[in-house]
């Protein structure tokens, strides 16, 4: 014999006990706020609390302190009410705060609901999150519960890499993250082969002589990055602390006059050359879209995905002369330190350590770099991208090193099991 109202009645009585402080056996601290609760309810609703009470000794289970930089007091209050009521109230509270708190506590049902709300609230969000995974990695969903807690949980199917639609759904799942700082590397702006979602329109760009005037007349809005590179990547004497604002759609409409359309040959992947100059339709930009500026030649692009192959073409054209072996067939050798190299290109790169040459210069702020990949990493500052996402709290960072330090500071307890 079943009693359908039993679950509702049980939750109601547990809620009354929490409000009265009756039989509450733990206290959750968020900043200066204290939340009395029942361990069994917390562990049943949150993987974070389940792992905490499973791994902590009995003497230290009475108090749980959450990271106040990630979990806000109002957001945790709503999540705690959800645990005892089965209803989630998102009114008068930013969905992003609830999403961050739910991700921190590993409440994946709430994470899914919040992401759905964000998709409905901002349909263009996928254009800003597409391609933000770390190089060489694909996103994969986290399990709803750890294997030790739910042995019979079926394995999640790997995400399909096929093309599903012209505008694919946004990939809100947290990207794979590697603990090693070296493996995370810089943002790779080179064109990668492999399956990619087709775009409704081919990537296109603007070329105009008014680019310099736009930069001179623009008001500074964004503070430039704090230089986290090594000494060999330090800025040249001519450096600016601010970058110009994004070009609005009306300006793009005026810049697109008298430009020739791009003629694309072939039916496979789209190829862009340095001199291909298609017209950017203002309707394609849409409201709130921003143009990206090439840091080498000041050309304008409708998105960072169109900028990537253009930057790659820059570096291929500049370095192609140096990739060949010497015509005499001799082994390339450094005349200063007598080191030998496999080709003249690596020798030229090595010679910069002696000469201090920095041939790659950002046209927006004047900062110079010895290597092209460092300029590519620096370009993210001007495009305002934050491609590196934390898999536990959904916070995003411009540089991979910032993500590494964030994880070491706030999520080290969750990372340690992955290192074993």
From Swiss-Prot:
Pfam families: BTB, zf-C2H2, zf-C2H2_4
Region (Disordered): 174-204, 216-248
A GO MF label: DNA-binding transcription factor activity, RNA polymerase II-specific
Domain of life: Eukaryota
Any GO BP: regulation of transcription by RNA polymerase II
Cell location: Cytoplasm; Nucleus, Nucleoplasm
Keyword Transcription regulation among record annotations: yes
Gene Ontology CC: cytoplasm; nucleoplasm; nucleus
CDD domains named in the record: BTB_POZ_ZBTB42
PROSITE patterns (alphabetical): BTB, ZINC_FINGER_C2H2_1, ZINC_FINGER_C2H2_2
Covalent S-S links between cysteines: none
Residue ranges covered by zinc fingers (C2H2-type): 292-314, 332-354, 360-382, 388-411
Gene3D superfamilies: Classic Zinc Finger, Potassium Channel Kv1.1, Chain A
Keyword set includes Magnesium: no
Start and end residues of each BTB domain: 24-92
Main location (coarse class): cytoplasm
Biased composition, class Low complexity, residue ranges: 227-241
Keyword annotations of the record: Cytoplasm, DNA-binding, Metal-binding, Nucleus, Repeat, Repressor, Transcription, Transcription regulation, Zinc, Zinc-finger
Task performed by this protein: Transcriptional repressor. Specifically binds DNA and probably acts by recruiting chromatin remodeling multiprotein complexes.
UniProt record similarity statement: Belongs to the krueppel C2H2-type zinc-finger protein family. ZBTB18 subfamily.
Protein name (Swiss-Prot/TrEMBL): Zinc finger and BTB domain-containing protein 42
């Amino acid at each position: 014999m079943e009693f359908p109202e039993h679950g509702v009645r049980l939750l109601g009585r547990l809620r009354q006990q929490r409000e009265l402080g009756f039989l509450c056996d733990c206290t959750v601290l968020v900043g200066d706020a204290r939340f009395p609760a029942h361990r069994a309810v917390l562990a049943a609703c949150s993987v974070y609390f389940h792992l905490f009470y499973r791994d902590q000794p009995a003497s230290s289970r009475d108090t749980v302190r959450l990271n106040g930089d990630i979990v806000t007091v109002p957001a945790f209050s709503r999540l705690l009410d959800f645990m005892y009521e089965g209803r989630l109230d998102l009114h008068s509270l930013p969905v992003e705060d609830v999403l961050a708190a739910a991700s921190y506590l590993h409440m994946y049902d709430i994470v899914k609901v919040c992401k759905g709300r964000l998709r409905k609230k901002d349909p263009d969000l996928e254009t800003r999150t597409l391609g933000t995974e770390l190089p060489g990695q694909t996103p994969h969903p986290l399990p709803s519960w750890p294997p030790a807690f739910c042995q019979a949980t079926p394995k999640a199917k790997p995400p399909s890499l096929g093309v599903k639609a012209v505008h694919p759904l946004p990939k809100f799942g947290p990207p794979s993250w590697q603990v090693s700082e070296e493996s995370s590397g810089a943002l790779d702006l080179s064109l990668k082969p492999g399956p990619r979602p087709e775009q409704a329109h081919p990537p296109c760009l603007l070329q105009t002589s008014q680019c310099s005037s736009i930069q001179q007349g623009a008001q500074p809005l964004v503070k430039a990055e704090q230089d986290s590179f090594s000494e060999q990547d330090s800025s040249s004497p001519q450096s600016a602390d601010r970058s110009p604002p994004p070009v609005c759609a009306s300006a793009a409409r005026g810049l697109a006059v008298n430009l020739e359309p791009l003629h694309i040959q072939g039916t496979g992947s789209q190829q862009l050359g340095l001199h291909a100059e298609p017209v950017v339709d203002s309707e394609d930009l849409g409201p709130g879209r921003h143009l990206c500026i090439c840091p080498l030649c000041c050309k304008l692009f409708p998105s960072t995905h169109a900028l990537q192959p253009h930057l790659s073409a820059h570096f291929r054209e500049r370095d192609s002369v140096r990739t060949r072996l010497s015509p005499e067939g001799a082994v390339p050798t450094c005349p200063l330190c007598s080191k030998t190299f496999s080709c003249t290109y690596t020798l030229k790169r090595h010679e910069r350590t002696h000469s201090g040459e920095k041939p790659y210069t950002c046209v927006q702020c004047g900062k110079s770099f010895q290597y092209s990949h460092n300029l590519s990493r620096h370009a993210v500052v001007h495009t305002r991208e934050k491609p590196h996402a934390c898999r536990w709290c959904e916070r995003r960072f411009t540089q991979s090193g910032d993500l590494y330090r964030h994880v070491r500071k706030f999520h080290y307890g969750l990372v340690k099991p992955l290192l074993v």
